[in-house]
């Protein structure tokens, strides 16, 4: 029985890098448009905290991690018990809340910040068209490109929503804690995400396209056995009867040769599925960098996220198993962020003040 090995081409890898880059750029542009420098708006952590002391950052992070662990565990439990309708209702409610409700406040803030004159009926008509089409594309049949576009919009708006309600340093603490939780949830034997992947592979179903970004919606066909030559097939056939008798006589003198089992490995083009949470946290980190740092640091974090994701994908090819997509990109982005914030930004400021052109 040939063993199947999934390989990932450059086209498949870029099929994931492009949407991640688009999502991060969408968040960065929207953060700049909604919060111009001359109008800095205060953030409010709804229902939890009303001050931004450093001591509160750890408490907020614990609340977020607890909520994430609870929702992930409940989602995996519902999936294993086949409570598909409950999961679909939860995902549908989140999509409506982000694409229809929150988008009203977000785009209203952009219109006010940029002094864009829009009438109320026109504004609500555009939001209804945007959100209604998005919900239809995410939860029912639609064109593949349109479905992928609204997955990116959903992740980007979710990242902006989280960014607007969290203090700056709390974002970094939350991202660090979420990265460790991602490792535990995916790699440990009792991790909920590992159990989810194993259950989905065992059932062979993909019932929730609204929470997974698929690099391709097409299934590549495996080559038929006729096109693959087995190594045990003889290259020469003897038709001469004397040769046949000679072989038969020799076989009486020699012990029978036990054929060695040769295991064929068939390479199949695989598709990469990235959770929408990964899109959200990549964009959350970049959006926080846009708020607090100059352009060189933003560019460094943007590139480092893509580099970290590019490092993760070959490891997936070698291990042939699901891996957490957050630790490598966020670790490299954190290194670039702090090194750029400590060394590069003061250096460029000094060169600018001294009129030194490099």
Curated annotation (Swiss-Prot):
Probable catalytic subunit of the gamma-secretase complex, an endoprotease complex that catalyzes the intramembrane cleavage of integral membrane proteins such as Notch receptors (lin-12 or glp-1). Probably works redundantly of lin-12, which provides more presenilin function. The keyword Membrane applies. Residues 221-242 are annotated as: Disordered. One of its GO terms (cellular component) is gamma-secretase complex. A motif (PAL) lies at residues 324-326. InterPro entries: Peptidase_A22A (IPR001108), Preselin/SPP (IPR006639), Presenilin_C (IPR042524). Homodimer. Component of the gamma-secretase complex, a complex probably composed of the presenilin homodimer (sel-12, hop-1 or spe-4), nicastrin (aph-2), aph-1 and pen-2. It is found in: Endoplasmic reticulum membrane; Golgi apparatus membrane. Belongs to the peptidase A22A family. Keywords: Endoplasmic reticulum, Golgi apparatus, Membrane, Notch signaling pathway, Transmembrane, Transmembrane helix. The chain crosses the membrane at residues 13-33, 58-78, 87-107, 116-136, 149-169, 171-191, 274-294, 298-318. The keyword S-adenosyl-L-methionine does not apply. One of its GO terms (molecular function) is endopeptidase activity. Weakly expressed. One of its GO terms (biological process) is membrane protein ectodomain proteolysis. This is Presenilin hop-1. Residues 1-12, 79-86, 137-148, 192-273, 319-321, 343-358 are cytoplasmic. Gene3D superfamilies: Presenilin. It comes from Caenorhabditis elegans. Induction: Down-regulated by spr-1, spr-3, spr-4 and spr-5.
